[in-house]
């Protein structure tokens, strides 16, 4: 079974308490306090290796981790060591990866609205690969690039593919904020040929969405990209041969999710590309969620509760929508388990509510769990992606700590914010 087909990290064990990476989760919560993000190193490495193995029979396949899923220095070092480059979308992600002593040559800069400052910073830092979303960005790139920088670009297009996923994470449909419409490609190519001489057009890029289970969506994406590449090459006497098919491959958040394995997905990609092996010399793939999600869990401590007369029982935890906004944003579903020993406890139906001042701060609604008590530890699975990376300081609450576990050892890789750090960037004018 592929890692992305598992809800839990591969080292998860139930001894007396729940264990991951050889570490007792209840003891971790006591040592580091909660909320606490926990990343299992073995699961992360195994996931990376599945991708590398799936494409080991292909030349010139570039696996680029989508850093937006979770961009942390220690994790970037692990991911690089397993053979990945990095899809980055901001100066902050570039800075983080550079600070981890990773070469800028391993980065591809994406994003639909890169600022002047970000483009200039990327170029000055040594980033030379860009995926370009619009005409203004072409102009900015050419303006800031020097003649000797050899800036390689891909044009991001919207292929018109609507995959089965949440509306907010579809990106490949025609009505999208991302990329050039197919009808705009010729104008972009002509500008690069005739005006923007500092830019080297290498190929095309598309990204059709996130949390995708339908393999035919990727097949359709590749067919459209190759068809457009052929048309451009013929019309403009070019020899473009690079494709970037993005990421978006799905994971198993609940028992109702049935994602295909990494190997099954790779087989479809390779079989489709095999028809064009003489035309496509380089392929970029940008998995993010499917690399880091399963490796991560979040620990919460149970606090009080509220029993609505003749209604729901709300159980409160010490985190919620500030450390995981996805349930509130997308009605995202997760799987939760009591980390404490609970063999003798009866089951009950409860709603797990966060601590934040919003009625929508509900992590789980009407689920069955062993009877919960104050100071119990809940473990929410599959929180490696788009939890810490989307976290906020709502209600002036500090962002949680993150630890890496492996072989019964735990190491802090992100320190919990301090109260004084919450006001470090604030200023009171002298006139007040």
Describe each PLM feature range.
Residues 1-152, 194-196, 200, 234, ...:
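A charged N-terminal "starter" segment
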Residues 44, 68, 90, 122, ...:
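Conserved, mostly hydrophobic/aromatic
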Residues 76, 99, 119-124, 141-144, ...:
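Short acidic, glycine/serine/threonine-rich loops at helix termini
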Residues 85, 108, 129-131, 154-156, ...:
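Structured core elements
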Residues 150-162:
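Glycine-rich, aromatic-flanked loop segments that form ligand/cofactor-binding clefts
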Residues 268, 279-432:
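Charged (often Lys/Glu-rich) extended helix/loop segments that serve as interaction or gating elements
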